[in-house]
Regions:
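Active-site bordering "gate/hinge" segments
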Residues: 1-191
């Protein structure tokens, strides 16, 4: 795999492990120069949307999104750079680009990265691995079953606009020079 990412650091649907993303963010933070405030946000997601209509699939989409943002604040000047890659080499270039953008920005005397507030992060389980075990066919079956259930619920029903299934799996990480460090994986679905 390119970018120095091993297959072992990927989950079942091909997203990076959030701790791997956090390590990449930490590497960018470690390259901060004296006097710089640096913040890195990394994320990846896979989203699926299915619409059933008339007992068939009307539409089906599945999309993978990847994004990175690096912000540099130096001397009250804030620069941001973004990309759709999260490999270490690209992130190093993104830091340089954010520095360049900061040098060209106006001064904002209150510009700053977030600082830890001392409040413990709640221990919430926002991820269910079962989403990654469902095949596209399983998800289609759920949308079709929903439409069938609605239609059979009352004989007065003559039709529905559509029955939708959607899900997403998201991994993200954020770190900055003020000591913020967080990584998480979350999932969600709806019918």
């Amino acid at each position: 795999m390119s970018g120095g990412v091993s297959a072992a650091s990927k989950n079942a649907v091909g997203l990076d492990d959030p701790e791997e993303l956090l390590q990449r963010a930490d590497a960018v933070i470690a390259a901060a120069r004296p006097g710089e405030q640096v913040e890195v946000s990394l994320g990846e997601s896979i989203d699926t949307e299915i619409r059933a209509y008339g007992g068939a699939v009307e539409s089906l989409s599945s999309a993978r999104s990847v994004g990175a943002l690096v912000r540099v604040i130096v001397g009250g000047r804030s620069g941001v750079a973004t990309t759709t890659l999260t490999d270490p080499e690209t992130l190093a270039c993104l830091l340089v680009e954010a520095r360049t953008n900061a040098a060209d920005a106006g001064v904002d005397p209150v510009a700053a990265v977030a600082r830890p507030d001392g409040v413990a992060q709640p221990d919430l389980e926002l991820y269910d691995p079962r989403f990654e075990l469902l095949s596209v066919d399983d998800k289609v079956d759920l949308a079709l079953a929903l439409e069938a259930a609605v239609m059979s619920g009352d004989p007065r029903m003559s039709g529905v606009e559509g029955a939708d299934y959607g899900d997403s799996v998201v991994v993200s990480a954020v770190a900055n020079t003020a000591g913020i460090r967080a990584a998480q994986r979350e999932s969600g679905a709806g019918l």
